[in-house]
């Protein structure tokens, strides 16, 4: 491709809208153009990158026996109502674009396709003889993000590969899940990316097990906790660990003490000369279910720990049926205004105890009149602890569960921390890294098939629900994440496997007929050898061309400059900036060798 004929415009300054390096560089280098908040045009260079990522994904999916298909982007609300997710996606979280057609039928623009594919399977899969099946698509998805940001990382429109598998039993599901795990590892390796596979929360997708694939980058939105022995890695939302050992309490007698002005853990510990590990603090939450009911929640947790709200949301979802609901649509720490709406009197915040009376809740038909009381294991195991006395400026010391307070249900709700000991080996401690979630695989189990009546006839003639898995990769996110992982002050450094072009031939002086002729010959030879090559034949200064070549990140640059007089050209490797002068006749072989060495 001749650069003089390409729609190619670069920017010298970082766009004001861009926050992270990869977003700045993709805009500056002419890969993408913002159309509206979270909506981008993929320009010719970017589309080539996306096609390459998609092709690698296709090859690895096809190698597992998965079959490519294409599902509708417009999805009827009835399917989502069958699964119970319409309220969550279209209203509670509000991430699904929804609309009414001219017959006033509700539709959604697909952020994901579990419901549609389950409906297809329900109609077409009849017998165990048809199983297993694994179908995938590469398609544009839509999410009405509250705050679109970071370019293609969190947009309202994005390209994704999503696959869905159907099975006769759980063992078959596990086998496909393992095959997808390996396929994803192959994909990210072939794309030239550094990544970690980590345990993850299943979120609104649901299911019994899930794993994320994180592309390592300092600007990643997700925190990963891992051990150096390579045996454990998890998203911080899911991570578990052994917390620091609690210091033995010096308070051996239960008594109420005046503790003026100690409504924080720090001030309380300073006043009592105690350690935060000796304190049980109460954290107040309120949850709203999809039936409109508000549930007050009282969490007891050790003073040096914090509540993981993802874990709490999952626990509330498991208990939703106890309150006549299906799911949680909001979870918040109530502020003063929120508390006024459901408390009978002002609460002694900062001094709450585990036995805060249910009578503190105002009588209201929309409010559940009893606290859900949960205790984290870090607090449940403490003895002779310090906690609030439910009275401003007062705490109790030397407290014990069952003796002084009923012990609530024990549930792991703490956020794992850097430096915590690993559960699999207490000599290993958790370290932290930032990552960009680029892939996610789930064992869905029977969640959707049971809800939507997708069954098959077993070998014994009985009707059973289909076992399901789903497997997603953000194709457009992978492309930008590659930039976030590999760039320098001059621009993008594309992995060779997904670079839009593998080589660029630069003519420093377009009026020099010798340079032009040599460049044309090298360009033709590289192209004939199957090397994807750009020819920078623009009427621009050499410095502009060199800067643009670095900015757009083409792996290998060939310059037909002064060395032509000796029958040689300069070749520059973008990643290392290593420059060498070689014979014109050696260019094709040299570039071929570099490409072969770089592509896994």
Swiss-Prot record:
GO MF: aminoacyl-tRNA deacylase activity; ATP binding; proline-tRNA ligase activity
**Is Protein biosynthesis one of the keywords UniProt gives this record?**
yes
Q: What class of enzyme is it?
A: ligase
- Output the superkingdom of the source species: Bacteria
Q: Is Glycoprotein among the key words of this record?
A: no
Enzyme Commission code: 6.1.1.15
InterPro entries in UniProt: aa-tRNA-synt_IIb (IPR002314), aa-tRNA-synth_II (IPR006195), aa-tRNA-synth_II/BPL/LPL (IPR045864), Anticodon-bd (IPR004154), Anticodon-bd_dom_sf (IPR036621), Pro-tRNA-ligase_IIa (IPR002316), Pro-tRNA-synth_IIa_bac-type (IPR004500), Pro-tRNA-Synthase_IIa_type1 (IPR023717)
A GO BP term here is: prolyl-tRNA aminoacylation
Write down the chemical reaction(s) this protein catalyses: tRNA(Pro) + L-proline + ATP = L-prolyl-tRNA(Pro) + AMP + diphosphate
Q: Where in the cell is it found?
A: Cytoplasm
Q: Enumerate the UniProt keywords alphabetically.
A: Aminoacyl-tRNA synthetase, ATP-binding, Cytoplasm, Ligase, Nucleotide-binding, Protein biosynthesis
* An example Gene Ontology CC term for this record: cytosol
Note the Pfam families from the entry: HGTP_anticodon, tRNA-synt_2b, tRNA_edit
Tell me the domain comment: Consists of three domains: the N-terminal catalytic domain, the editing domain and the C-terminal anticodon-binding domain.
HAMAP family the record matches: Pro_tRNA_synth_type1
Q: What does this protein do?
A: Catalyzes the attachment of proline to tRNA(Pro) in a two-step reaction: proline is first activated by ATP to form Pro-AMP and then transferred to the acceptor end of tRNA(Pro). As ProRS can inadvertently accommodate and process non-cognate amino acids such as alanine and cysteine, to avoid such errors it has two additional distinct editing activities against alanine. One activity is designated as 'pretransfer' editing and involves the tRNA(Pro)-independent hydrolysis of activated Ala-AMP.
Question: Self-association or partners: how does it assemble?
Answer: Homodimer.
Which family, according to the similarity comment?
Belongs to the class-II aminoacyl-tRNA synthetase family. ProS type 1 subfamily.
Q: This chain belongs to which protein, by name?
A: Proline--tRNA ligase
Its source organism is Synechococcus sp. (strain ATCC 27144 / PCC 6301 / SAUG 1402/1) (Anacystis nidulans)
């Amino acid at each position: 491709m001749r650069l003089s004929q390409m729609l190619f415009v670069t920017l010298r300054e970082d766009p004001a809208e861009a926050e992270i390096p990869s977003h700045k560089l993709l805009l500056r280098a002419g890969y993408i153009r913002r159309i509206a908040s979270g909506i981008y045009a993929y320009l010719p260079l970017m589309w080539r990158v996306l096609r390459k990522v998609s092709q690698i994904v296709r090859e690895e999916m096809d190698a597992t026996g998965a079959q490519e298909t294409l599902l509708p982007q417009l999805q009827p609300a009835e399917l989502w109502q069958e699964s119970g997710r319409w309220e969550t996606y279209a209203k509670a979280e509000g991430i699904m674009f929804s609309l009414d057609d001219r017959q006033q039928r509700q539709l959604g623009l697909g952020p994901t396709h579990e419901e549609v594919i389950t409906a297809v399977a329900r109609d077409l899969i009849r017998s165990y003889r048809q199983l297993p099946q694994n179908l995938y698509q590469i398609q544009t998805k839509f999410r009405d993000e509250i705050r679109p940001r970071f370019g293609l990382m969190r947009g309202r429109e994005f390209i994704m590969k999503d696959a869905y598998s159907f099975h006769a039993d759980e063992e078959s599901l596990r086998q496909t899940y393992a095959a997808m795990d390996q396929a994803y590892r192959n994909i990210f390796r072939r794309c030239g990316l550094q990544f970690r596979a980590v345990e993850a929360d299943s979120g609104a997708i649901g299911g019994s097990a899930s794993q994320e694939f994180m592309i390592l980058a300092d600007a990643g939105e997700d925190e990963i906790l891992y051990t150096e022995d390579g045996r454990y890695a998890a998203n911080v939302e899911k991570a578990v660990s052994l917390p620091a050992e609690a210091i033995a309490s010096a308070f051996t007698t239960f008594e109420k003490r005046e503790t003026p002005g100690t409504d924080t853990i720090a001030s309380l510990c300073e006043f009592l000369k105690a350690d935060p590990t000796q304190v049980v603090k109460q954290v107040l939450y309120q949850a709203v279910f999809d039936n409109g009911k508000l549930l007050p929640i009282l969490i007891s947790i050790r003073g040096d720990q914090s509540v993981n709200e993802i874990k709490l949301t999952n626990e509330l979802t498991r208990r939703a049926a106890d309150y006549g609901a299906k799911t949680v649509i909001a979870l918040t720490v109530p502020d003063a205004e929120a508390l006024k709406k459901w408390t009978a009197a002002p609460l002694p915040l900062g001094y709450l105890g585990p036995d805060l009376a249910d009578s503190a809740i105002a009588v209201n038909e929309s409010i559940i009149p009893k606290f859900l009381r949960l205790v984290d294991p870090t607090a449940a195991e403490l003895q002779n602890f310090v906690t609030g006395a439910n009275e401003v400026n007062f705490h109790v010391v030397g407290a014990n569960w069952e003796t002084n307070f009923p012990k609530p249900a024990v549930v792991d709700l703490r956020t794992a921390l850097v430096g915590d000991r690993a559960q699999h080996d207490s000599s290993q401690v958790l370290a932290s890294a930032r990552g960009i979630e680029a892939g996610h695989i789930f064992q869905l189990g029977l969640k959707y098939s049971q809800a939507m009546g997708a069954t098959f006839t077993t070998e014994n003639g009985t009707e059973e629900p289909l076992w399901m898995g789903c497997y997603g990769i953000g194709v457009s996110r992978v492309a930008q994440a590659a930039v976030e992982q590999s760039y320098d002050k001059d621009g993008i450094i594309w992995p060779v496997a997904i670079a839009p072009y593998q080589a660029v031939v630069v003519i420093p002086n377009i009026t020099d007929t010798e340079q032009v002729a040599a460049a044309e010959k090298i360009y033709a030879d590289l192209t004939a050898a199957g090397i994807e090559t750009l020819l920078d034949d623009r009427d621009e200064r050499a410095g502009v061309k060199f800067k643009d070549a670095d900015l757009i990140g083409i792996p290998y640059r060939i310059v037909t400059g002064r060395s032509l007089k000796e029958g040689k050209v300069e070749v520059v490797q973008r990643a290392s900036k290593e420059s060498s002068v070689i014979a014109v006749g050696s260019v094709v072989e040299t570039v071929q060798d570099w490409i072969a060495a770089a592509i896994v």
